[in-house]
Amino acid sequence: WGCLRLPLPLCHALAAHCRCPASHTLRCREPLTVSSLSALLLGAHRPTDVIIENQALLTSLTRDDTRMLWDLRHLTISNSGLQYISDDAFQDNHRLSHVNLSFNALTSLSWKTFQHLPLQELTLEGNPFNCSCGIRWLQLWQNGSRAELGNQSLLCWEGSMLVALDSHPLHDCEPPTARIEHPDVVLRQGDSVNLTCHIWGEPSATGEWVLPHVGSEPSVTKLSEWELVLEINNISSSLNHKDLTCRAENSVGLAEDSVMLNVTFPPVILLLSEAIPQHFWCIPFSVDSNPTPRILWLFNGSMLPEGPYIHTRIVEYEPNSTVLHGCLQLNRPTHVNNGNYTLVVQNPLGRAARSIQGRFMDNPFSFSPEEPIPVSISPLGTRNSSLEGPVETADEHTFGVSVAVALAVFASLFLSVMLIALNKCGHRSKFGINRSAVLAPEDGLAMSLHFMTLGSSPVSSTESKLDGLKSNFIENPQYFCNACVHHVQRRDIVLKWELGEGAFGKVFLAECSHLLPEQEKTLVAVKALKEVTENARLDFQREAELLTVLQHEHIVKFYGVCTEGDPLIMVFEYMKHGDLNRFLRSHGPDAKILDQGQGQPCGQLTLSHMLQIATQIASGMVYLASLHFVHRDLATRNCLVGHDLVVKIGDFGMSRDIYSTDYYRVGGRTMLPIRWMPPESILYRKFTTESDIWSFGVVLWEIFTYGKQPWYQLSNTEAIECITQGRELERPRTCPSEVYDIMQSCWQREPQQRSIQDIHSRLQALVKTPPIYLDILG
């Protein structure tokens, strides 16, 4: 059989005179062995290339012969007896692009046979065509070099003379024309329309109207050989933006003219679904209207004002349609946004409305944070139950004053006794009393802001078995200068939406009244504690005291706490651009890829911008080092970006949830950011201000790689091996050598050789005179 790589069923199905020299190729060359293509391919696999030559018995080709060749791309029938090809011979061969019909017995050939094909090459040399209107289309194609016909020498018989087709005049053989005479086609739903089509051609042309589904039955009237009138009554909105086409054709070719109807109608709500969580929450809807409708929303029956955080977004326009697909987009909605949402669409012709319930989260409070907190008063006597409220008597007033005075005297005596006792107990320390900060068991990184540890805090296996890790704080006016934690009234806090969630609880964007004297309302980030155990409350209190101490322009500002009821709340300043890692990625060269083409493109950070960011973080680190505070988790994910590229150190405790791949779990609960840790911290769990400097070097590397993960090509175990063996991160392509030298200064093997003051000074110098950097690797 001589078959190579062809599926076995095809080889068995072919006649013995055909060959399959390549996969999916059929070749029949032995003379007088093929009379029908359909019989040859019966029951066979479908080839993509068919080559038939020297077959005088093969005289016709119809749709029945080719209907099973769905994958046919190349067809050759040459040196055969082919005389006739039907108009629909290739109706089912939508991939056919190369046709060779050379040296057959074709005297005529219709353009209709090839009109729907993606034809790249049509070979017709050696056929005895008659010079007639039936091959005028070939002359036009040849003169226009379509389907490679311009490179062929086609001949036709004019009587007994064989002439060149491309230059032979074929009289009275022209393609038809079609023209729709139409009035103003802006119609209202329910109107009627009459359209007249004028057709012409030589030889004479036939005409027809090609219509979409129009609902009511259209009427077509033939006024003459040249005029067709279309009448449609009770126009439907489904005809809006639909084409009505008049088609004329003759033996030379085809002509069409179309008109698009513009049907106006009142708005219709096609879809309104329940809210679905995406990167944001979306209440999806679809509406249809012409003209374009006004879209607005009601929330619990009142007008919903739209802004940057709640707004309507059209996500898709259907081509040649008035249907709009969109959603009401809610960024980080909270329980405040739960309620009834009504979509209202209207245009000059009418109005439509539909409602749906939206529920985004449960109320994290036992009461509405927008309402005043009820204060319960234990009755000291008979209360007035009238609507005017309680009436205070003179006796009650005298009694109240007496109680207040007695309490004040008692408090003074108690404080005096406590001070004497403290002085006696503390005589062994020349600095005074000791204070301890207890971290969560087995998790030195459990606190949301890691300013809990002073100086060095090595973690041993023995200590990990204790109930908590204790570090002694030296009494110093800088640390505990009678720091008074500011208390914020819960009624002054109005939650807007959730920013994120961590192991401790949730962080919300909120609006706080009376927080700053120069502003009536201030946007803040609110951290709500999930646990309400006694240990959690103690940790909350200690953290609040420490955060109150930290006051620096590049440390996230702590405003205070709210302890009225549950949950316990910490209030921080709000940094509008979020964490630095995402900010770097969205302003880097791969921003469009990471965003998947969505959203507005951000400008790419320059060398000057990156140096400014690094210097600000270094400034915050100098401040922490001066207080001997150890951060323990310094990374771009734990820095926040505000207005005008202001960068501050801070961490709301969400990073271990959002950036979980940046942490390595040790034992049961401990999550360590090993890619940012120096060898002494990995090997001995020793965290110092010097270990923070190592982490700062990695932060520099993150900045100059636009937020890439350190050692991103390695697993956590492989990264640990590289760090402990002394390998360093490679210099980023966008990083000048002067900056890489600073990184390497942070990665000195000996901790005492790392100096944050020196690093900060060098960065400040680079900001003033940025290095000239040429990207020779790019």
Curated annotation (Swiss-Prot):
GO terms for cellular component: axon; early endosome membrane; late endosome membrane; plasma membrane; receptor complex; recycling endosome membrane. Gene3D superfamilies: Immunoglobulins (2.60.40.10), Phosphorylase Kinase, domain 1 (3.30.200.20), Ribonuclease Inhibitor (3.80.10.10), Transferase(Phosphotransferase) domain 1 (1.10.510.10). Its EC number is 2.7.10.1. The modification Phosphotyrosine is found at Y479, Y659, Y663, Y664, Y773. Keywords: ATP-binding, Cell membrane, Developmental protein, Differentiation, Disulfide bond, Endosome, Glycoprotein, Immunoglobulin domain, Kinase, Leucine-rich repeat, Membrane, Neurogenesis, Nucleotide-binding, Phosphoprotein, Receptor, Repeat, Signal, Transferase, Transmembrane, Transmembrane helix, Tyrosine-protein kinase, Ubl conjugation. Ligand-mediated auto-phosphorylation. InterPro entries: Cys-rich_flank_reg_C, Ig-like_dom, Ig-like_dom_sf, Ig-like_fold, Ig_I-set, Ig_sub, Kinase-like_dom_sf, Leu-rich_rpt. It is a single-pass type I membrane protein. The active site is at D633 (proton acceptor). The record marks Y773 as: Interaction with PLC-gamma-1. It is an enzyme of class 2 (transferase). Belongs to the protein kinase superfamily. Tyr protein kinase family. Insulin receptor subfamily. Exists in a dynamic equilibrium between monomeric (low affinity) and dimeric (high affinity) structures. Homodimerization is induced by NGF dimer binding. Interacts with PTPRS. This is High affinity nerve growth factor receptor. It comes from Gallus gallus. The lineage of its organism: Eukaryota, Metazoa, Chordata, Craniata, Vertebrata.
